[in-house]
Amino acid sequence: METGKEGTGMLYKSKYKSPLGMITIVCNEKFLLEAGLETQACLLAESAQSISRNEIATVCGTGAGEAGIKGKMTETEDAGRKNALELMKRALNWFDLYFAGKKPDPRMLPLAPRGSEFRQMVWQELLEIPYGKTTTYGAIAGNVARKLHKEKMSAQAVGGAVGHNPVAIIIPCHRVVGSNGSLTGYAGGLDIKYKLLRHEGADMDSFFLPK
């Protein structure tokens, strides 16, 4: 995950139809910046240009992979948009793999979520949680405190950073649960959090939905 390197320039967005609803994906020509379900805010999407899957297929072809895709644009077409189309293809392919149960690695994608240094540290911790596993807000707080050479860190502060994760599912904030097993604090909705963990094969007997 890149920090402080998200750059500027044109923003692009596309939609992915998932089993849990439509996912909005936002990128620029270099990095994936946001991904959110309909119940989650994608703040950059309002100022982003829309690109369709048809355009992606026309320009990038049908193949996708970590190394990128060979484009088919003419020399007169915009290179920045072409790069964004290639990146968006990779993001859509990642979600295809995820919902097919293939356990894709988030590091397949150049991620650059925008946020404070503290939030970036927390989001980096989220990327370390294995597929199908969970951790607690307190455990993340302990890890961040050690990296900052502090005696302790507020689990509530960590919860705020987790809740503001702008790249849902790929940066797996849904894998963070309360210390008592409560499935609490998911911006996409607790029912979505439950379904994501069940999809990944997590031990659901250990969790409960708060009343």
Language model features with spans:
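…primarily DNA-binding HTH/wHTH and HhH modules…
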Residues: 179-211
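Catalytic nucleophile loop of clan PA
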Residues: 176
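Major-groove DNA-recognition helix of helix-turn-helix-type DNA-binding domains
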Residues: 162, 170
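Basic nucleic-acid-binding alpha-helical/helix-turn surface characteristic of O6-alkylguanine DNA
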Residues: 2-149, 199-211
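Short, positively charged loop/turn segments that connect secondary-structure elements
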Residues: 145-159
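Short cysteine clusters
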Residues: 173
